[in-house]
């Protein structure tokens, strides 16, 4: 190519860009229709969520934004009587979730370490992955019935909050294991190899290099797993009785929790004060789950800033 009028020759890419034309009429119509369909699908998906949130907030916000709701229980409160709070149910929900996390998090993290660091590509890893896939799809009532049959019917243990936590472990474990597994896969092999080159053992490499690198993602998975199980109702209905007062003992057969508090007032007349407490309990559960999701986002953002 030669230079004309002191200007550089046009490349093939430039010629292609200059010859680019706007899409034809039919293509423009199809693009507009696709945009409309996608937008409509998004709106249809968001409308039920907004409707549910609006209904719960409008019917339960009055009680939730009072101090007595967070500081008092339902002991001595009848459906026709004003007052009382959800302190017992909030404490019970957090206690059950904490016990569940103490069991599910170590099992999930260690299971992911086994799959990625020790048994990658083996039959054992495929068997564990298949089992986890099955667990991730079982309904909560199946997990509750399994724990009831195993711990209460066969071993003779009593119904308790610990039994509820064990059932929730079966639901939380797949989330923790899968999220940890994905985070461990993202850790560059060069970090492991550099540690091995310095003479560090495999286990210390995992504890000092791999886990700290993936800690942000692992923590996010744990928090999301907790948010997933805190609203489950079937294990609570089957494995423990609802208590209207505060009970800190996880071995007791009665325990207050937000899902069972909601269930206990489902048959009350809409004009009774107890009916408003049901909506307030639902709003409280939404607030807790929302805070956990915000915590997960904060952990993920902090881990990204730390990497930079």
Regions from the PLM with identified roles:
Residues 17-40, 54-100, 121, 264-276:
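Periplasmic/extracellular loop-to-transmembrane helix junction in inner-membrane transport proteins
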Residues 101, 179, 202-240:
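Transmembrane alpha-helices
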Residues 1-44, 296-308:
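Transmembrane alpha-helical segments of polytopic membrane transport and secretion proteins
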Residues 115, 181-185, 196, 223, ...:
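C-terminal transmembrane helix and the adjacent membrane-cytosol boundary/short C-terminal tail
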Residues 133-171:
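Generic hydrophobic transmembrane alpha-helix motif, especially the helices
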Residues 77-80, 236-287:
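Interhelical loop and adjacent transmembrane-helix boundary motif
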Residues 107, 120-125, 129, 188, ...:
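Amphipathic cytosolic juxtamembrane alpha-helices at the membrane-cytosol interface
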Residues 100-132, 145, 297-305:
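Transmembrane-helix boundary motif in ABC transporter permease subunits
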């Amino acid at each position: 190519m030669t230079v004309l009028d002191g200007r550089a020759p046009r490349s093939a890419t430039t010629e292609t860009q200059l010859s680019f034309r706007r899409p034809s009429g039919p293509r423009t119509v199809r693009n507009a229709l696709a945009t409309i369909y996608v937008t409509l699908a998004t709106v249809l998906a968001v409308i039920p969520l907004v409707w549910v949130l609006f209904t719960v907030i409008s019917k339960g916000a009055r009680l939730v934004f009072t101090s007595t709701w967070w500081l008092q229980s339902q002991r001595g409160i009848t459906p026709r009587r004003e007052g009382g709070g959800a302190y017992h149910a909030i404490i019970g929900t957090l206690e059950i979730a904490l016990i569940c996390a103490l069991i599910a998090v170590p099992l999930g993290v260690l299971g992911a370490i086994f799959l990625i660091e020790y048994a990658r590509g083996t039959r054992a890893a495929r068997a564990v992955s298949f089992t986890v896939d099955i667990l991730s799809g079982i309904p909560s009532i199946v997990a509750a019935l399994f724990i009831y049959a195993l711990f209460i019917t066969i071993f003779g243990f009593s119904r308790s909050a610990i039994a509820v936590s064990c059932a929730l472990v079966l639901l939380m474990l797949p989330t923790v294991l899968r999220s940890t597994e994905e985070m461990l896969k993202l850790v560059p092999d060069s970090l492991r190899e550099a540690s091995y080159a310095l003479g560090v053992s495999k286990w210390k490499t995992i504890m000092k290099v791999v886990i700290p690198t993936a800690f942000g993602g692992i923590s996010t998975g744990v928090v999301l797993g907790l948010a997933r199980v805190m609203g489950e109702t079937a294990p609570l209905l089957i494995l423990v009785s609802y208590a209207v007062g505060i009970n800190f003992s996880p071995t007791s057969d009665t325990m207050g929790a937000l899902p069972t508090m909601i269930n206990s007032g489902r048959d009350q007349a809409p004009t009774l004060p107890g009916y408003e407490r049901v909506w307030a309990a639902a709003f409280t559960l939404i607030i807790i789950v929302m805070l956990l999701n915000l915590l997960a986002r904060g952990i993920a953002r902090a881990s990204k800033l730390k990497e930079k």
